[in-house]
Amino acid sequence: MYWYRDGNLLSLLPWLAAMAAVWLGGWLLATHAFRLQARERLIVGLALGLVLYTWLANLLGHWLSPDLTFTLPALLLLLVGGLLAWRRKEGPWLDRGDLKIWPWLLAGLGLIYVFLLWSKGLTLFDEHKNLSLISIMGNGDIPPHFLPNYPLNFIYHYGFHFIGASLMRLGGLLPWSAFDASKALLWGLMLLLAGLLGRRYVGRAWGGWATAAVVALAAGTRYLLLLLPPGFLLQADKVVQLQGTSALIGKPFSQALSSPWPVDGGPPLPYMFGFLNGIMDPMVMAHQGPNIFAVLILLLVWFLIPRLSGRWSFLLLAAIFSTWALAWETTYALFLMGMVAFSAITYWRRGNTDLPQFKPVLAAAALSLPIALVQGGTLTELARDFVFGIQGPGLLQSAGAWISILTPARVLKGTFDVLGFSLRWPPAILSAHLGALSLFSPVQLIVGLFELGPIILFTPYITRWAWRRAQAGDWLLGVLASSAWLGLLVPVFFQYQSDRDISRLSWQALLIWTILLVFVVADRSFGWRAWLRHSAKAALGLMVFGGLVIAGTQFSAAATTRLGDGYNELDAAIAAKLWGRLPEEAKVFGPMRSTTVLTGHLSGQLLDKPGPSDVWHTLMAAPMLDLLISERYDFAYIDSRVWEDLSLEVRNAAGLDAVCVQTLAEVWDNSHVNFRRMLDLRSCP
């Protein structure tokens, strides 16, 4: 049971109907609110519809039932699109010529299928967190809580998870199939947008496919370190320390480059560490999900801003920006910072910011800020904690941190943190796998440059090209170039309380520069010498090669199916009986990881285990009925893998066979040895 809770393919029909309405509504909006070309409207309409569907579902989910939360946004999109088409009163509502893009749609289906095959065979990257979010959001916990009945919601960018949650609620899917299908859908659509964007800038079909290939495959070039003299790599062993999961390789850096990466849930043919990257992994490896959605929104914004048409496009753009904040606040903030930086530079050089459509876009971005602070997600919860002090003293202490900005930098260092940021000294290139690589250490600097990839050598030319195009009217390129520079430099000079998290800023910078380099290479009017143009092509080829190796590695997982990390057919069977059927106010005991995922009901702390003093640990070691009742649990979930690990004395003394205990649901394997069981304790005094 990988796909459906009831095993019936027809269960998907309500979701397909909702998505048809989303696509049709998005197509209408793309046609009548923006000045798009015929070959762009259908695909951009699907992306626009999905992004706005996510935003509406998040807003409605605060108050409405799960069924309405995931159904009503589709109808609203269709209604708004129809009203906008009716108000225009000129030309057809939709142009049948838009359907000539059908070969691209077939290519998109192929891309979705390939990524789905990879995802079905892999259980990588925050699997528990993603499955839990999809499950509880599909069951109506919006915004998702961190603990049951706890005032602080989960601090996370959960926008991506609405697509998977809709597949569970409307499509009858299980958590793992909903997760994999939502990733695959957005990944394929993301590459179609990249292809259309490349087609627009290059003016030829090959430009579209080249841009899509770069977005999918481009990565850092750590593997090129293997070409350096052995003596250099031995020097690197002394100053480069592996971080996180990479440290489990247990070898010096020089040997780790040609070693498998020991990650749980990886493909049968393991990833080679030398082809991975701690700054820019290829998008073929984007199995966590939110980064796919963030790139899709970036490309959508890139598409729509030059094609605004009236107040409706302004309002829709504000909603898209707000969804971006919900999908990945880091890249959203980086784009806004790029707008501010570009505005300042333009005003300084020209004395004004009179550029086509610049002020409406700036207003849409400004409108999205207060929405982002109240709609839910990371920014909302950080703002709530800052003001109300749910996890600390609140505004008073936080305000003190802001005052510290006015003090000299040498006093700041090691004394104050501002919103989790502090100065980094010495400056360094930050890699999630290799840590901070100091700019003042020649060996670390060289390793860091290879980690970034050869794109870094072409940034002056990319910036010059983008700025010239910006001054000629395509100012969005100037904003993107500015945000890319900020994304590179902020992690170099500032560190964060969770330092590896801000490596995402550098990832965004490298992605933007790589896309722009494709456009620069294709622009024959740009004054490059021939050897520079050929060198840029070679640099793109070297960055794409690493992604090709990763993609080839993942094909070894295409023939396998994994339900989820640690889940099997019994878990799927009990989920079919339990998901969405427990009372909303019920308190449920069980292994926090599986109980939440399989029932859609938050059974405890969403991420990680509770502190050692929590009674949950006592109950897991000895689930005594009297203690469960005294802790006001209504249900107890029993997994035979956990139950059999208890001593016979504990099992006999637990009292879970009392008359008052009823079995709500139970499944066994064919050997009648392994089981999953949900016990109803509500009748016990």
Please name every model-derived segment.
Residues 91-100, 306-313, 348-361, 457-484, ...:
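Membrane-interface helix-loop-helix junctions at transmembrane boundaries of multi-pass membrane enzymes
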Residues 109-297, 561-565:
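Active-site lumenal/periplasmic loops and adjacent helix-entry segments of GT-C-fold
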Residues 1-95, 483:
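Membrane-embedded, hydrophobic transmembrane alpha-helices
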